Amino acid sequence: MKNITLLLAILILSSCSVRKNNDFDFEKIAKISDSIKIQNITIHNLFKSQILAHKNDEFDSTIIVKNVYLPHRKLWDSCYAQIFGDENATRFNNEQGMVKWNRTLFDKDKIDFIDKTKTITEINIDKLIKSNLEKFSRLVPYQPNAKISLLFTPISGIGFGGCDSQQFALELNNQSINISYTLQKGLPHELNHLVYEKFRNNDVDKNSALSQTIDEGFACYFTYIFFDKNITEYEAVENMSKQDWDWFIKNEKEIFKKTKSYFSDLSGNNPLLRNDRHKLFPEAPKTLNYWLGFRIVSKYVEKYGKNSWKDIYKLTAKEVLEKSDYEQYIDKL
């Protein structure tokens, strides 16, 4: 009889453990701030309410409207509705559509949503965001007026980006996103884009491949600076490995020589920006323009001093390249 009682107790505890491990930790999630604002940057934790709407047996549509749709309505109505076209627009640009897909959001791949949310709660996201935004405000010469939402979505495609500084999103369920790396290392990268955008828009060649290369490379370099160079250069550039970095260094001269002719291209569809499509360097382990931009910016700072990275905000992409003497460096390789 004692053995039977003990077996039943083990089974009950095991059953409870399984249920707990296969559901959201609503108590921890509820403690996360709805939003965090430092100066002109606001980060909305929309995913919090998307989860809490499912806390009770009956789905709470009011939370979705009040805490998910309305706080960043411009993102849903404008950015998502436009990106995914007329067929999907009604999912995002009205309350009814938002409630409908959020109701069934976790019906499929719920374990994946739970695992990613667990990653977020273990990071202590409130502390992380606050400290990052405070440090960012001390470092940069200009504070963007920006809204960024951390969210789940039924159709992923933005990743970490958006339509403008007021319509930015991090899709937590996007399969291409490494949640831990993006939250801990990716935020400074994206924030620097928002700062540089203000100055880059004054460049008549702002849509050139070179401009996009400097933009991405500068964001990577800023990440390196943001973490006081306590991360490696290759980690700052798309979180690549040492092996990836070594491949780029080995092929540095050839990369520059073969991509230089595309610097003025305005199409956005060229081997420098889309090596994945054009296969100019089929063996390249990561994105060419991120790495090349980082190298150009690095050479600029190497020439003008450790704080000279701040100059780049007010320089055109052509000026950064010319002043860096990167081409002269390449010619000597």
PLM features: what roles do these ranges have?
Residues 14-15:
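C-terminal motif of bacterial Sec signal peptides marking the signal peptidase cleavage site
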Residues 180-193, 245-268:
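An acidic intrinsically disordered interaction segment
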Residues 21-58, 207-253:
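Post-HExxH zinc-binding segment in Zn-dependent metallohydrolases
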Residues 95-238:
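Acidic/His-rich structured neighborhood in mature extracellular/periplasmic domains
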Residues 77, 252-333:
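Pan-zinc metallopeptidase signature
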Residues 68-79, 150-157, 318:
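Acidic helix-start/capping segments at beta-turn-to-alpha-helix junctions
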Residues 1-4:
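Positively charged n-region of N-terminal signal peptides that target proteins for export
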Residues 19-126:
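Non-catalytic architectural context of zinc metalloproteases
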